Amino acid sequence: METSSTISIGSCLKEHQKIYKEWFNIADSDGDGRVSGNDATKFFAMSKLSRQELKQVWAVADSKRQGFLGLSEFITAMKLVSLAQEGHEITSDLLKGSIDMKSVELPVLEGLENVVSKQKVSKTNVDVEDNVVTKPQVTAKTPWFKSKSIIKPQVNVVTIVDGLKRLYTEKLKPLEVTYRFNDFASPVLTSSDFDAKPMVMLLGQYSTGKTTFIKHLLGCDYPGAHIGPEPTTDRFVVAMSGPDERTIPGNTMAVQADMPFNGLTSFGGAFLSKFECSQMPHPVLDQITLVDTPGVLSGEKQRMQRSYDFTGVISWFASKCDMILLLFDPHKLDISDEFKRVITSLRGNEDKIRVVLNKADQVDTQQLMRVYGALMWSLGKVLNTPEVVRVYIGSFNDKPINEVAVGPIGKELFEKEQNDLLADLMDVPKKACDRKINEFVKRARSAKINAYIMSHLKKEMPAMMGKSKAQQRLMDNLEEEFGKVQREFHLPAGDFPSVEHFREVLGGYNIDKFEKLKPKMIQAVDDMLGYDIPDLLKKFRNPYDN
């Protein structure tokens, strides 16, 4: 599976590689390894293409909407410029078409020789200045106890993700910490949460083909994979890119600052012992991270034997993932109580869910129609949404499709469905930046509602006597209190947290210790949503947009 729509340096002719790197360094005026919009407009202007053509070149090259071009994206842009100069229409399908991108000639850039010669002259002057020996200045040493603390300058915002990090630290995080959002909803975000690659989680009952699906996607086994008819995957396995093939225990993963799994420590050692990371070098894993989960059990007794909060872990991963695949087997369409709880825990992430009816070639066409109808009926009782969920039908493994059972029409259907699902997965890295913005805005709104609820409960507490009775009354009538908050601040009912979950967490706190409403904090988040984020998106949009 190819997930990248850009062209790597290794896919160019050797004589072109050095030239592209030289051009990239010229275009990258500040030397930060990124060609920003302003840099690109100056450099691309030498191609003499129209503004509309260059707008399309940028849109295709910056497929992930990062707001800048790295070396791979820059090479893609240069090849697209060359094709546009030859008269080709620039579309995203051009990279997937019949054109051999490796043999595309260098684009014609008028005036580039002058720019190269000027840069060489300036570099020579800098080297001469560096070779001049200057006498080092002696500065008076200040005792450490008299030195003033130095305020570090703010890091320049060079990507949309950098901007979101700054907005979170300056405006959203203070509100979350003040009103204990990390305890009631989601842990505090770290830098690694923003920088993480997009994730795809696979859910399903045992032996529905989750691990086999990942193997089929990668085209090979991955470390720690176990496949069989019995419940084989007994742990959460995160398959991600790494320099070599190895598995990393969950406790180690949870404490690594550069990994987005610090929040899993709240589920305790019992869960972390059932969590591991599988690393291997692979082009697919360079773009996305895959999360394999234990098979959902059918019996209540087996569920009670789990030593950790299974649905809580699923809910945590669901909030972090970009796509959730629910896998079903034609012979196991019944949705158990635990599976129902798991699907319910995905509340708020319905837009990420895709349903896969796997192993569909094990039944004939007539049975498949009945199975499909039964599956939709079962899902309709669990997924409380009026929209029809997307269902992919196929047999996602390395074996050839059983044409005897499904016939030639079924074979063609399965191939089209598989291509559609792979295309959906290919879009995940492209939409990752948009998804981060979407999740950030969703989180900000949830944090605001959490602050309104906490401050309202604080306001309902008596000043002196009867505090314990008042707290119990508020907890018993929590749904009614939510309604008061909704009416007072004109909030949508669908954005409020689960009453049962909130009541459960609230039982461990003293409401009287909560903070009163701080309008300045709320206003800061409103300004962030109304002004800062739109300005950030405007700054890193296509530089050729009017």
Curated annotation (Swiss-Prot):
**Annotated Dynamin-type G domain residues:** 194-430
Annotated region (G3 motif) at: 292-295
Q: Where is this region: G4 motif?
A: 358-361
Recorded consequence of changing G37R: Slighty increased nuclear subcellular localization
**Phenotype upon loss of function:** Early flowering in short-day growth conditions.
- Identify the EC number(s): 3.6.5.2
The reply to whether Calcium figures as a keyword in the UniProt entry is yes
Share what the entry says about its subunit structure, partners included: Homooligomer, and heterooligomer with EHD1. Interacts with AP-4 complex subunit sigma (At2g19790).
- Mind telling me what this protein is named? EH domain-containing protein 2
Identify the species of origin. Answer: Arabidopsis thaliana
Q: What is the lineage of its organism?
A: Eukaryota, Viridiplantae, Streptophyta, Embryophyta, Tracheophyta
Gene name? EHD2
